[in-house]
Amino acid sequence: MQNFEDLFTYQDGIFLTWMWNTLFYGIVGTAGMTLISVACGYGLAMYSFRGRGFLMGCIIGSFLVPGALLTIPSFLLYTDLRLIDTPTAIIVPSFFNAFSVYLAKVYAEGAIPHELLEAARIDGAGEYRIFFQVGVRLMSTGAATIFLLGFVGMWNSFFGPLVFLRSSEKWTVMLGLYSWLTVKHDQTVDLTGMVVVGSIISLIPMVVLMVSMQRFWRTGVSLGSLK
């Protein structure tokens, strides 16, 4: 119990700040990534246009580029834009995820019949209305999966915050707990015990998210059986 008390009081309760930061980065960044990925995947799956195959090849090819390879160019760019040590440096890059776009495209191809879109067009619906009222609803299970994978990635992010964030008040929970492990022995508290307790507490949002997403997957299975 002493570790729990120390965890929430050490350094003026900075652990709660790290938890809030990570939750904020995760929700905002993953929500933007999900919307962009679903829109791009829907467009690639439902529309035929010149260069679609080349564009899809570029998306798949980007899987081969190590994220660490882009660290220095990204750092220089963010420095020029004065984004270092700001939430923007963590949130905006998470909006664009090639794997999520690919996943959304594959799911849209199997979940959305072209005949349904044609029927909506005949009824006078515009493309934006079709996307939000038809496409998004039919892709809800895929969107939930993309959101879950993205949020878990953001929650466990370490390298990006380590490079782009300097102020400890803006760190994520993973980076903050790691910093406690690298601190010299503190005679007042048991930092190792606090890290263990903090790691356990940091799992709670993941469990809550997993449970809350169950209804989307159940809905997807039901729709699939009805088809």
Residue ranges and their predicted role:
Residues 1-227:
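A structural signal for multi-pass alpha-helical bundles of membrane permease subunits
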